[in-house]
Amino acid sequence: MTNTRKNHPLLKIINNSLIDLPTPPNISSLWNFGSLLGACLTIQIITGLFLAMHYTADTMTAFSSVAHICRDVNYGWTIRYLHANGASMFFLCLFIHVGRGLYYGSFTLLETWNVGITLLFSVMATAFMGYVLPWGQMSFWGATVITNLLSAIPYVGTDLVEWIWGGFSVGKATLTRFFALHFILPFITSALVMIHLLFLHETGSNNPLGVPSNSDKIPFHPYYTTKDFLGLLLLILLLMTMALFYPDLLGDPDNYTPANPLNTPPHIKPEWYFLFAYAILRSIPNKLGGVMALILSILILVMFPFLQPNKQQTMMFRPLSQFLFWILVADLLTLTWIGGQPVEDPFINIGQMASMLYFSLMIFIMPTTCFIENKMLKW
């Protein structure tokens, strides 16, 4: 009698990925965030699909169509707020997932790590374009400011910006193409997730100790399916609490004002999950320098495996690196706070110092500490 689960061409793939997958027995709850990100992506695609059924990507009616969804569509307000706060949950899980990768040295799995960074860029692009769609004041001016940064690229910058806008300013053409791209990108992200998992299952998961666990592995089901399900319940609880009780907590009040090209809001700022990068962008007085720092703030993760010559994979037994890691976390929280503040003293100076500390930690201080810890191992 053949086991269908193990022999059927399609079920075999699911079985080897989710049921009989050999998993280290000691991975902590921080390893839950991969599955939570999958859940977030699913929630976003489903809620987004229902929103797209009622949304119109036209400058004259976009704002009204969102109001119509909230007022006239059955449970439209729920779907809209689940989608908006689902993005915040998505990024919260993403940042913890990346942080866990840095702390426990998962960046040594190079292919998985690099596909993960591509995924991060993909999700950030999707979120940015989604923020433009309600066509409120912050949507319009956010789109204008961020796309205009590309004009800093020498020689082709201005042409590139006008090509993206589809005209000489952000308008109907921009909104239409942003909607099209916002719709297609999550499916591209889903394909990248498959590649991410494919590479991960080639090497197997890392674990908190950073030691090979080939001699002692357990099946993914029922142990980690149960554990992941608990994480999923907590995620849904948090998302529902946000969407039903505090739906506008993380939003901007300016986005409840229809887009007006003649009236600039006093403080243009993106959603909270982009504030750290926005603070880095603003901390450099030069436009091109700011754009380069903005891109490098994420792209530096690609260099991380080569900047960390550590002999112990995880930071679990490296107190100096642990200390610096938590300084990095505190620095990112500071940058997030600064990104939401107006451009005036003392925020300018704090932002510049925090940006300098961010790049110093990543490029110089953490690698040097790794080198010192390697030397200390020999004593």
Swiss-Prot record:
Keyword Transmembrane among record annotations: yes
Gene3D superfamilies, alphabetized: Cytochrome Bc1 Complex, Chain C
Binding site for a ubiquinone: 201
Binding site for heme b b566: 97, 196
One of the record's GO molecular function terms: metal ion binding
Required cofactor names: heme b
Binding site for heme b b562: 83, 182
Entry's Gene Ontology BP terms: mitochondrial electron transport, ubiquinol to cytochrome c
Topology versus the membrane: Multi-pass membrane protein
Pfam families in UniProt: Cytochrom_B_C, Cytochrome_B
GO cellular component, one term: mitochondrial inner membrane
Cofactor note: Binds 2 heme b groups non-covalently.
Cell compartments where the protein resides: Mitochondrion inner membrane
TM stretches of this protein: 33-53, 77-98, 113-133, 178-198, 226-246, 288-308, 320-340, 347-367
Database matches in InterPro entries: Cyt_b/b6_C, Cyt_b/b6_C_sf, Cyt_b/b6_N, Cytb/b6-like_sf, Cytochrome_b, Cytochrome_b_C_euk/bac, Cytochrome_b_N_euk/bac, Di-haem_cyt_TM
Keyword vocabulary terms for this entry: Electron transport, Heme, Iron, Membrane, Metal-binding, Mitochondrion, Mitochondrion inner membrane, Respiratory chain, Transmembrane, Transmembrane helix, Transport, Ubiquinone
Family annotation (SUPFAM superfamilies): a domain/subunit of cytochrome bc1 complex (Ubiquinol-cytochrome c reductase) (SSF81648), Transmembrane di-heme cytochromes (SSF81342)
Subunit comment: The cytochrome bc1 complex contains 11 subunits: 3 respiratory subunits (MT-CYB, CYC1 and UQCRFS1), 2 core proteins (UQCRC1 and UQCRC2) and 6 low-molecular weight proteins (UQCRH/QCR6, UQCRB/QCR7, UQCRQ/QCR8, UQCR10/QCR9, UQCR11/QCR10 and a cleavage product of UQCRFS1). This cytochrome bc1 complex then forms a dimer.
Biological role: Component of the ubiquinol-cytochrome c reductase complex (complex III or cytochrome b-c1 complex) that is part of the mitochondrial respiratory chain. The b-c1 complex mediates electron transfer from ubiquinol to cytochrome c. Contributes to the generation of a proton gradient across the mitochondrial membrane that is then used for ATP synthesis.
Family: Belongs to the cytochrome b family.
UniProt miscellaneous comment: Heme 1 (or BL or b562) is low-potential and absorbs at about 562 nm, and heme 2 (or BH or b566) is high-potential and absorbs at about 566 nm.
Protein name from the UniProt record: Cytochrome b
The species this protein was found in: Lepilemur sahamalazensis
Gene name of the encoded protein: MT-CYB
